[in-house]
Amino acid sequence: MRLGKYNKSLGWLSLFAGTVLLSGCDSALLDPKGQIGLEQRSLILTAFGLMLIVVIPAILMAVGFAWKYRASNKDAKYSPNWSHSNKVEAVVWTVPILIILFLAVLTWKTTHALEPSKPLVHDEKPITIEVVSMDWKWFFIYPEQGIATVNEIAFPANTPVQFKVTSNSVMNSFFIPRLGSQIYAMAGMQTNLHLIANEAGTYDGISASYSGPGFSGMKFKAIATPDRAAFDQWVEKAKQSTNTMSDMAAFEKVATPSEYNKVEYFSNVKPDLFKDVIGKFMDHGKSMNMSQPEGEHSAHEGMEGMDMSHAETAH
């Protein structure tokens, strides 16, 4: 008996401790700072609420039935031959079907509305940032500003940002949790992602796909500046850097595998560097396909250069 009381007390203590510890957690997905993130949170909470319509009654009934039909309750109705109830059948089938239908319609609409490659409707002209996943760092190119950075980006708040994403190594995943969707980065291909920050701040960016021993340190900072003037100042700071990215040799030097990299800025970036990074894998594919049968080689060749805008995932 004492052991049972001890275990019960320990269980309540563990529950309380877990609640206190979890209260200190800062969930980026549930505290978004961008329009896409807000809409995704709304979808998550709506789906969660709908599922509770089934879960909560099921839990209550499980507890209630166990209490009502406990061995010590001599007043409980005993029905050993009970096997069917039209009312019960109607409830257990109708409610889940209605929930599934509602979720199906909701998911269909939001999936298309939050399509990552779909440009955001906004009065401000979008900022274009080209993203290259490396081992194990993030390389960012600003084609309009003529600069590049490692593990840091900046853009004005309340201004759409178009991310063009590829990889210089294995498949990876580009993700700024507080702003919204993640997108895959794949060598020789380009994926597109559109995000916006509703307020100024510095947000954590991560790699959401395991890519090797340096994966855990593959993080970056996304700075949403208060206005365009602050963004221009950040650009000017990058342009003052003595580091340059004038050719592919300089790019390959930066792309050398390394872990826990510091922020770097580059001025005088080679034009069309992003396209060249994609192109070097496409050329490699051509040479590799030369050993394949002619028909198979032609099929692969026809796929080269495709924009994977519709191959990404939004979640």
Feature-to-residue mapping (PLM):
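Non-transmembrane, membrane-proximal soluble domains of secreted or membrane proteins
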Residues: 26-43, 68-315
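Membrane-water interface of transmembrane alpha-helices
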Residues: 57-72
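Transmembrane alpha-helix boundary/anchor motif
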Residues: 20, 61-64, 106-109
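N-terminal secretory/membrane targeting signals
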Residues: 1-27
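Generic secretory/membrane-interface signal
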Residues: 17-22, 45, 51, 83
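Hydrophobic alpha-helical transmembrane segments
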Residues: 10-13, 44, 49, 90
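Alpha-helical transmembrane spans of integral membrane proteins, capturing the lipid-embedded, hydrophobic core
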Residues: 16-20, 52, 56, 93, ...
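Alpha-helical transmembrane segments
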Residues: 40-57
